[in-house]
Each structure stands twice: as structure tokens, then as C-alpha cells.
């Protein structure tokens, strides 16, 4: 179970972080970069000061380094892919250096052992297949699994004003309206109105910058579930979220074949227990848990996707992703776990 010692993470820390990282949305990440701490507190049944103190704690220990604001992927028809590859551990460092040079790489999540996730952006099926095959070849991958996160559909038009506001908030999504207004040369009222519209239309999302090695008495882990097709994926996902409610910080659902659940666990035995338990659920073909060793974030290297000439002429600011109106938010259920 989660530790309660001073300086260590507990269930409240995890749930507060999950509320900001994903919230109740079915999207892979939160589509509300300005969600109020009061709303989070009310949803969790705690006070607003506790929410602020827990976030300050996550920042203070170095785990949560900041947030980045991006445009909804569906606005450009690009897609994010999370590719899990099993590699030769002796070549991991060289492989990472090679992967960092590839275009469209957003993040590399290195696991303890012989696996890693490579997150990259792709424009179409052809380029997706080409990039995935190249990564697998570079890794000498013995096996791989492709997960394709689904973002909400969005067709809102973005003006130059919207683009400037988004850029001003790119590295600080909670920047004060007055500060943004001064930076972009618009009134605070205009900034507020425009941003509220973008949030309402699900045109933007936030992604955190994290350092898993900074956690004390806990570990970040990735639970990958392969569905068997004998049970609806929604039913399977809800059961997993209910069973692991105290340790899930993010659920990537919507892919017909796989579900990815990011966890924070405090016992190494959970690495064995969780996949064994989840693997016994109806509708699950297999489950595996990998402990995160390191996380390399290359969000700024994606800037080229925002500046391509043909895109800039058609829209004020590009985005990158694939939408799916079919994804439904998993139900939240109160439960306790021992992970």
C-alpha cells in the first residue's frame, strides 16, 4: 500500500496528480489545462489547500517538473504512437542516442530490464509503418507492441490570436491572463475568452514533464494489457481502473487491441502480482508490468511539426493526432487496493 511517511507519496498525492494528468476524460491526457484546484478538491472530497500542498510536494521532490501545452492532434490529422520494444539491454544507451535523432520522437520511456516505450508522431499509415519498422530494426527488437492513443474529435478553427495565446502558454499553461495579455498584446478579457473557447472545444491538452527517479519509496510502472476480444474493452478497462484505483495515474484507452495504464506502486512485489491479477480478468489475453527507469522528453523537438509551411498556410497553428468520438470515459469507482 502507499506509504504515509513524511516526504513519501500516498493515495491522495496519486489521485491529485491523476486529476491534473487526465481527470475524468477519456482522452490520453487532460484537455483542460486550467482545471481549478477547487474543482479537483471537490471531486476528491478534500480541501483546496490540500490539493495545492500535494502539488507543491510533487514539485519539491523533483518528480513533477512542469507542464506543456499542446494543440489537439486531431486538428492536423497526425497521430501519436506508443511503441513498446524489447531490446538487448547491452545496446540500450546506443539505441537511445540513435532514436533521439529520428524526426517526430516525443519521448523515450526506458524500463528496468530490456524494454522501452518510444512515443512518436506520424502523419499517415505509410509514415507510421516506416517509422515503427525503423525503430524495431534499430532496436533489434525481439518483439514489439503498438498502442495508438485516441484524442477527442475537434474541428474548431484556430485564428492567429489563438495561436499566439497557445504559444504564450506552451510552457506554463496556468500563466495569469494578465501576463499572457501583456506578452501577446491583447486584453486579459480577450485572452480569457479565447482560452475558454479552446478548452470547451477540446482544442488543447497538457502533458507533464516528470522525473520518475525523484520518487521516494515509490516507482512509476507501465501496465500493458492486451485484450482478448471476448469481453468489451470498456468493461475490461472499468474493472482494471476499479481494481487499481489507488495507483493508476493515467489510462490510455481507445485502442482496440491494447490498453496502457501508468501506475505508481510502492511494493516491488506488485510487479508480479498486478499482471497476474489483471491477466485473470475476462477479456484480457495478457498483461505485463514494466518499471520505469528513465524518461527522456523531447517535446521541444516536435516544434517542426508546428511550423511546416503547408500547414501554416491552412491553419494558424498545427496540431498532431488522431481523433475518435467512440472512446468513452471509464467510470470512476471508489475502491482500495494494496499496490
Predicted segments, located by residue:
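A compositional/biophysical signature of low hydrophobicity enriched in polar/charged and small residues
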Residues: 1-339
